[in-house]
């Protein structure tokens, strides 16, 4: 690639334009240019389409040569699948240098996952109001705050005494899911 960098699963679109992973400094899975990875979803290349390893590998394995691909370049109409969200890698992470979606079995991100914290059983008096998200936080696989993505489900009423179960779930940008319950 350009500037003596490397890419995984380069797949030609047309001419000099490719689908490929974010650049790597060497031909090794742990040399990802993390700053460039964090630009996924923005204009950051010389015309190629940069993707996380999971997605470009899917194209590489599932789209034979000659497959028609429609590329959307319109924020108002990002296509039928929408614009994918990307996860950000903290530059000071000991796992920086690895794409969190790389299926390589030695990828240290595979030991990480989305998390929920602060979910605990509570007691509420009849007639009181309750904030099920009070004190509850969530982090994605890379440790970024995704508290605003928490979904809470369950049936309850504060009009009558009883025991109710509420379920919490959060899914991060790479599909890692954390769940918890409280009563």
Put a short name on every predicted segment.
Residues 122, 144-182:
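Serine/threonine-rich, repeat-prone extracellular segments and beta-strand-based repeat modules
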Residues 1, 125-129, 161-162:
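Solvent-exposed, conformationally flexible loop/turn segments
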Residues 111-144:
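Solvent-exposed, low-complexity, repeat-rich "mucin-like" stalks and linkers
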Residues 2-112:
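Exported/periplasmic cell-wall-interacting domains
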Residues 18-19, 130, 146, 178:
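Short, isolated positions in well-ordered beta-strands
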Residues 57-58, 139, 172-176:
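Short beta-strands and strand-coil junctions in structured, solvent-facing domains, enriched
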